[in-house]
């Protein structure tokens, strides 16, 4: 039995079966592998239930019958009973919800026709196929729109529910069910970046390969549900003005998608709020997280050349100061102390958090000015004033290391810093400044 991702298993009513089920439930795998349990639903459809091997379990309501229960992170349910048994999938689709916002489905409608009925545009005008090589794997990322409609007996066709945008990942080789978590994470990272919230909504379907008259095609065979996914938290209040659009980014989606999912280069987006409602305020944890994001962008961005030059100059300066200290007649213990201080601060030069924010600001302030000038709710600052707020912001961040967060007004540039991080991510994805400005300018209309 499955209810709200809680799975209850009831063994056969003999002591051996009860003991075997409990022993299985108590097995622990430190690597936290996913184990799949398959069965048949009451309406004769296949279902696959994921269980984490490091997850806990509990006794069912009838302890005397040996029932156990556990929470499943993923449930796969076949669409109908006519489909065959599959041990894996050849593709995965992400449909509707927030994907409708980042890639509006109205592109499928031909608005130039006479208003005598609904006319659809050629699918080639709204379908793009991208070849992606990521983490030593090749697949196709497809951006398109489902423009078919479904008629239900006794009901009027609801086009708003049947015309949906979707992102599809197609694979040449069959993948095990455990891999769908990886592809789900890939798309979620992209949608999180575009919507600027971490709780997103979209439907997920698994695809298999089939053929008609020797012509191979992909078809959906199962629906997938993930524990913790939003059903209505985000999209009922999220609007098209809240998100960055795929059309603005264009073909840059490939490099952006790869950057957001590359283990060595991906940005830190933990500073983004969980939902639109959470945009109304800034939590102290977001200040800590956005500072971590700054560190990553500085480390992986366009700073290395200038930073290397500063390191060389700081080492040279340290050697001169140490030579000067050696020339002074005083106690040796004081000389050693002074040289240790110089050596630790200059020989191993590292810019401060304040320096890193200034660097990102000076690098992307032209784009930031375009965005801030577009919206009345965002303050514009002179360089001198912005530097003052950087001092306040970093002091606010450092206060968490010694006591609770001291809100000193530095949060006034929190959104500005977020925009600078977005510009840095676009640059690291090799997306031109003009495209980055257009994307951010169109996607940050409602910030708080």
What are these regions (language model features)?
Residues 16, 25, 50, 67, ...:
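A sequence-composition feature that detects small, non-aromatic residues
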Residues 39, 55-62, 66, 84, ...:
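Residue-identity detector for glycine
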Residues 14, 29, 41, 64, ...:
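Serine/threonine-rich low-complexity intrinsically disordered regions
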Residues 69-76, 80-86, 221-232, 322-337:
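Short N-terminal signal/transit or membrane-insertion segments
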Residues 178-255:
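Internal, Lys/Arg-enriched amphipathic helical interaction segments that engage polyanionic partners
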Residues 1-198:
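Long, contiguous, compositionally biased segments that the model treats as domain-scale units
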């Amino acid at each position: 039995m499955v209810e709200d991702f809680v799975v209850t298993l009831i063994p056969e009513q003999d002591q051996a079966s009860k003991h075997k089920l409990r022993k299985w439930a108590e097995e622990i795998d430190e690597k936290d592998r996913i184990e799949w349990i398959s069965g048949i639903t009451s309406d004769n459809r296949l279902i696959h239930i994921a269980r984490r091997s490091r997850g806990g379990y509990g006794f069912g309501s009838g302890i005397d019958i040996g029932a156990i229960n556990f929470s499943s992170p993923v449930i796969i349910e076949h669409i109908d009973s006519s489909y065959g048994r599959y041990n894996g999938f050849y593709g995965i689709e992400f449909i509707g919800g927030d994907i409708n916002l980042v890639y509006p489905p109205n592109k499928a409608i031909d608005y130039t026709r006479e208003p005598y009925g609904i006319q659809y545009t050629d699918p080639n005008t709204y379908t793009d196929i991208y070849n992606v090589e990521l983490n030593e794997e090749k697949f196709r990322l497809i951006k398109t729109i489902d423009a078919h409609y479904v008629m239900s007996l006794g009901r009027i066709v609801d086009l708003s529910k049947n015309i949906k945008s979707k992102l599809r990942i197609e694979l040449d080789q069959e993948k095990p069910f455990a891999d769908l978590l990886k592809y789900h994470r890939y798309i979620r990272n992209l949608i999180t970046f575009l919507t600027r919230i971490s709780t997103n909504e979209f439907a997920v379907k698994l695809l298999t390969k089939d053929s008609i008259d020797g012509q191979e095609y992909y078809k959906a065979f199962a629906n997938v549900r993930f524990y913790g996914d939003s059903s209505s938290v985000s999209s009922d209040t999220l609007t098209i003005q809240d998100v960055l659009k795929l059309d603005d980014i264009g073909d840059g989606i490939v490099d952006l998608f790869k950057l957001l999912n590359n283990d060595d280069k991906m940005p830190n987006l933990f500073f983004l709020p969980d939902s639109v409602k959470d945009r109304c305020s800034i939590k102290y944890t977001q200040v800590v997280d956005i500072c971590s994001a700054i560190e990553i962008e500085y480390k992986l961005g366009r700073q290395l050349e200038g930073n290397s030059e500063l390191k060389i100059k700081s080492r040279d300066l340290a050697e001169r100061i140490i030579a000067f200290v050696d020339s002074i007649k005083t106690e040796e213990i004081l000389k050693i102390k002074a040289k240790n201080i110089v050596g630790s601060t200059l020989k191993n030069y590292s810019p401060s958090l304040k320096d890193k924010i200034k660097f990102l600001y000076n690098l992307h302030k032209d784009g930031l000015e375009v965005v801030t000038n577009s919206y009345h709710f965002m303050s514009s600052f002179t360089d001198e004033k912005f530097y003052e707020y950087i001092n306040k912001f970093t002091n606010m961040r450092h206060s968490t290391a010694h006591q609770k967060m001291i809100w000193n007004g530095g949060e006034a540039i929190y959104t500005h810093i977020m925009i600078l991080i977005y510009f840095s991510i676009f640059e690291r994805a090799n997306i031109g400044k003009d495209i980055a400005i257009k994307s951010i300018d169109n996607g940050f209309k409602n910030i708080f």
